Amino acid sequence: GEALGLSWLDYDPEAMELRIVRQYTSDKTLRPPKSEMSRRILSIDKALTEYLDKWKTMQRDIFRRRGLEQKDTDPIVHAFSVGKDADGFRSISVTRPSGHNYSRWFRDFCVDNGYGTYSDVTKQFMRDGKLHTRGTGYSGLVPHGLRHTAATALVASNVDLKTVQARMGHASASTTANFYTHAIRANDRNAAEVFELLSSK
C-alpha cells in the first residue's frame, strides 16, 4: 500500500529521499500509514534516484500521448481510468492501480523475467521478441517478501536494528527482529567464531 500511495510530491531527487505519508488501501482509498512510525522519510541511493528521474520523464511522455499533463500529485505508480465526461464523451484520467491489479502485474513481470513460475500455464505469447506466460498457481517473488529480504540484508550488513526498524516503519524493533529478519548462515558461523575466541581467553 505504501508504494502505491507515493506521489511525485513525495520524491525529493536533490535530497535523494522518499516521504512515506500515505498508503493506498484495498478499498481504493488513500489513508495515512498504519502508525506514526510508518510516516517516515527514506533515504534512497543514487541508482534509484536516477531510475525515478527516468521514469518521471517516461511517465510524462505517456501522459502527453493521452492528452494529459503530469502533475506533482500524480502517483508514481499509475493506471488509467476510462470513463465519460459530463457531455458523454470518452475521457481518460490518471489513477492508482488497485492492489489486486498491481499484484497480478507483479506476478506476470516476475514470470516473464525469471523470478517466478505458474504451475498452470493458460496462455503464452510473443511481444517484442520475448515470450510472455500467463497462468495460475504462482510461486516466486512477492512484493511483501522483498521487505523481509531488505530487512534481513540490512541487519546482515551490520545496520543497527533501530535504523532498520525506522526504514521498515515498524512501531517496535521487536516486530522487525521477530518477523522481518531471518537468520543468515554466515552470521551464525561468525557467532561461533566469536564464541570460540571468548571461551579461549
Where on the chain are the PLM-derived regions?
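Acidic donor-binding helix in nucleotide-sugar-dependent glycosyltransferases
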Residues: G1-E2, T163
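Conserved tyrosine-mediated DNA breakage-rejoining catalytic core shared by Y-recombinases
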Residues: G5-D74
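The DNA-recognition helices of helix-turn-helix-type DNA-binding domains
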Residues: D10, Q59, T149, A171, ...
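Short, polar N-cap/turn motifs at the start of nucleic acid-interacting alpha helices
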Residues: D10-E17, V159-F179
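Catalytic-site neighborhood detector that most strongly recognizes the C-terminal catalytic loop/helix
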Residues: Y24-S26, M168-E193
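Ser/Thr-centric signal marking residues that sit
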Residues: S35, T149-T152, T163, T175-T176, ...
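Short, basic (Lys/Arg/His-rich) helix/loop patches that form interaction surfaces
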Residues: L42, R60-P75, G83-R96, H100-A166, ...
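Short, basic, alpha-helical segments at the C-terminal edge of helix-turn-helix-like DNA-binding modules
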Residues: E193-S199
